[in-house]
Amino acid sequence: MKLRVLSLMVPALLVAGTAGAAEIYNKDGNKLDLYGKVDGLHYFSSNNGVDGDQSYMRFGLRGETQISDQLTGYGQWEYQANLNHAENQDNKNFTRYGFAGLKFGDYGSFDYGRNTGVLYDVAAYTDLQPEFDGMTYGADQFMFQRSSGLATYRNNDFFGLVDGLNFALQYQGKNGNGEETNNGRDVLGQNGEGYGMSMSYDMGYGISAAGAFFNSRRTSEQNGANGHQNIMGRGDKAEGYSGGLKYDANDVYLAVMFTQSYNAARFGSSDSSVYGYANKAQSFEAYAHYQFDFGLRPFVGYNQTKGKDLGRAGNGKDYGDQDLVKFVDLGATYFFNKNMSTYVDYKINLVDNNDFTDAAGINTDNVVAVGLVYQF
């Protein structure tokens, strides 16, 4: 389950559940909160590479300082510690968020660091399943989700003039290999310089709409340099365009999201025989839940990304159009109180097993996730 983080004064990032953070310090205009969760999580699947313990902990700090009547400073850091490896092994722990910024009253906020890309302002509408949510994109994938080197300006209620009209402008610096930037990374996590924008409007009666786009340069390795001559999906630019609609009222939540992207939807891994980016991809997500008064929240979701015109791989095969992600998600969460919950999340995989999925390492088996969560 993804913890929706609240960037102080940046409400596009959401907090999951109803648990509040623990206040560490609050004096003379300075505040510091600690938040987090522990998820005792197990996967059940016939795929041995997925089946087993998936437990983890997330925790973070967020703070603010009142500089003047109209100027507030803020910052946030969040970390994930995986709990399913031996103590003498690399647990692959990592920082999810880390940024600092300034809020200028009704004139908006500006921050820089590791944060969320503007396309997630739309994707957040459907990214709500307790475990298998937001599967049509991933971290460090241009400006789809969490990424590094993001400078973000956000404005809520359009300078205080139009209630419910919010927008964001974003720039991302280059994150290349070790020879191009100081934070070298795998080819499927790289990006060139890019920019994006999002806009949302709360129309009242529980109805909201949002749209976003990004345009980024791609790196030389993403176009076949330095031993990546077999990577698929060449192109100078990566682009994404997304729109979403949601209804959230009377204990009912309904949302849909559609994204069209070019040279940006990734598949495989750099050590698989088939990997790279779809020349064109269409992603669709839908999600619905009902919240009962006694704590039960049943839900249903659907995720699909269709890669179009994938082209010829390094193994000489032309793969044409392929499903990169396609599944129905069913389950329920039960909230004991604001700090404790449990859930079952059943991913019914609709991707057909074929030569492409085998070569790209795409799982085609069903997965059941069972979790017990404490959050604060």
Curated annotation (Swiss-Prot):
Provide this UniProt record's keywords sorted from A to Z.
Cell outer membrane, Ion transport, Membrane, Porin, Signal, Transmembrane, Transmembrane beta strand, Transport
- Return the Pfam families for the record: Porin_1
Q: Where is the signal peptide?
A: 1-21
PROSITE patterns per UniProt:
GRAM_NEG_PORIN
UniProt-annotated location(s): Cell outer membrane
Question: How does the entry describe its membrane topology?
Answer: Multi-pass membrane protein
Listed GO MF terms: porin activity
Q: Which CDD domains match?
A: gram_neg_porins
Which GO terms of the cellular component aspect does the record hold?
cell outer membrane; pore complex
Q: Please give the biological process terms from Gene Ontology that the record holds.
A: monoatomic ion transmembrane transport
SUPFAM superfamilies reported in the protein's UniProt record: Porins
Whom does it interact with, and what assembly results? Homotrimer.
What does this chain do? Forms pores that allow passive diffusion of small molecules across the outer membrane.
Q: What is this protein called in UniProt? A: Outer membrane porin C
